[in-house]
Swiss-Prot record:
Pfam families on file: C1-set, MHC_I
The family this protein is said to belong to: Belongs to the MHC class I family.
Keywords annotated in UniProt: Cell membrane, Disulfide bond, Endoplasmic reticulum, Endosome, Glycoprotein, Golgi apparatus, Immunity, Immunoglobulin domain, Innate immunity, Membrane, MHC I, Signal, Transmembrane, Transmembrane helix
Topological region Cytoplasmic: 320-336
Region (Connecting peptide): 290-298
Free-text comment about domains: The alpha-1 domain is a structural part of antigen-binding cleft.
Region (Alpha-2): 106-197
Start and end residues of each stretch annotated as Alpha-1: 19-105
Chain residue ranges for the region called Antigen-binding cleft: 19-197
Protein name, per record: Major histocompatibility complex class I-related protein 1
Designated gene of the protein: MR1
Residues annotated to bind 8-(9H-purin-6-yl)-2-oxa-8-azabicyclo[3.3.1]nona-3,6-diene-4,6-dicarbaldehyde: Y25, R27, K61, H76, R112
Transmembrane segments: 299-319
Organism field: Bos taurus
Length: 336
């Protein structure tokens, strides 16, 4: 039995182009550099777009976006190159101290993330945190002017840092004021790239994972910005059981990709449809009407394979943090 289930795409334009934007700076120190991995790396991002890069090999802070290079004078790069050379040495010392207090040797990492977000409603957030070997170590709470320590070593550092009220207030001010000012400035510099919308392309395929069990995959790719909603529906109702989601990942070309899968018994004759919402367009794929923009391939006994061309967005993901031991780490002036 062959079922033809053409799909309908419903397009609803959003009334606002407001988005959440972020500015983040990441730093990574490595105890045993080698195999092409520098001892120290610092990278800046607006949303998911790389804007700056520094490493211990080049020892230069350099632009990673043309609109950054075109809008910031040479003395900006020279000034922050000097700051980052200082951070490079500080990270090396601090990582050695952490290894000593944890009684660790060999390969270990030390990380820092600082940044801010400008939300769709105009409100702001800020974050500053450290990690050791990819585990949370110290997290700054700008509202209470305090640090959250993740273990006994981190707690020793917390007490020292919290004794310096001036430094705590400085970090709060940087996160809430200076960081947001830089973010707005960078958004203006790169507005053509950062505020564009590229709709997702969507493709559905399948494979038999076990005898009598088929897995349907709905893949969205080539979209920007990264915020996207993608899900499977069974007979018109959203399903969560037997469903697996992939992360929203960069594709390497300034767009994003993601996927969702569902396991099914093709003998049951249920109707499955993939629903995608992205950016300024809301796309709903469901059955019972012809649409020239969709290629529908049908399998027997109610099993459908959809190959769809749509529009979409990607999403960013980052995370890695610290876990400490005895040692006092001094905060320096953040780079921009």
């Amino acid at each position: 039995m062959m079922l033809l289930l053409p799909l309908i795409i419903v397009l609803m334009m959003k009334l606002s182009d407001a988005r959440t934007h972020s500015l983040r700076y990441f730093r990574l120190g490595i105890s045993e550099p080698g195999y092409g991995i520098p001892e120290f790396i610092s990278a800046g991002y607006v949303d998911s777009h790389p804007i700056t890069m520094y490493n211990s090999v080049s020892q230069l802070k350099e632009p990673r976006a043309l609109w950054m290079e075109e809008n910031l004078a040479p003395d900006h790069w020279e000034r922050y190159t000097q700051l980052l050379r200082g951070w490079q040495q500080a990270f090396k010392v601090e990582l050695k101290q952490l290894q000593h207090h944890y009684n660790h040797s060999g390969f270990h990492t030390y990380q820092r993330m600082i940044g801010c977000e400008l939300l769709e409603d105009g409100s702001i957030t800020g974050f500053l945190q450290y990690a050791y070997d990819g585990q949370d170590f110290l997290i700054f709470n700008k509202d209470t002017l305090s640090w959250m320590a993740m273990d006994n070593v981190a707690d020793i550092i917390r007490r020292v840092w919290e004794a310096n009220r001036h430094e705590l207030q400085y970090q709060k001010n940087w996160l809430e004021e200076e960081c947001i000012a830089w973010l707005k400035r960078f958004l203006e510099y790169g507005k053509d790239a950062l505020q564009r919308t590229e709709p997702p392309k969507v493709r559905v395929n399948h494979k038999e994972t076990f005898p009598g069990i088929t897995t349907l995959y709905c893949r969205a790719y080539g979209f920007y910005p990264p915020e996207i909603s993608i899900n499977w529906m069974k007979n018109g109702e959203e399903i969560f059981q037997d469903t697996d989601y992939g992360g929203i990942l960069p594709s390497g070309d300034g767009t994003y990709q993601t996927w969702v899968s569902v396991e099914l018994d093709p003998q049951n004759g249920d109707i499955y449809s993939c629903h995608v919402e992205h950016g300024g367009v809301h796309m709903v794929l469901q059955g019972f009407q012809e649409s020239e923009t969709i290629l529908l391939v049908v399998k027997a006994v109610g099993f459908i394979v959809l190959a769809i061309a749509l529009a979409g967005v990607g999403i960013l993901a980052w995370r890695k943090r610290p876990r400490g031991k005895n040692k006092v780490i001094c905060l320096s002036t953040p780079e921009h």
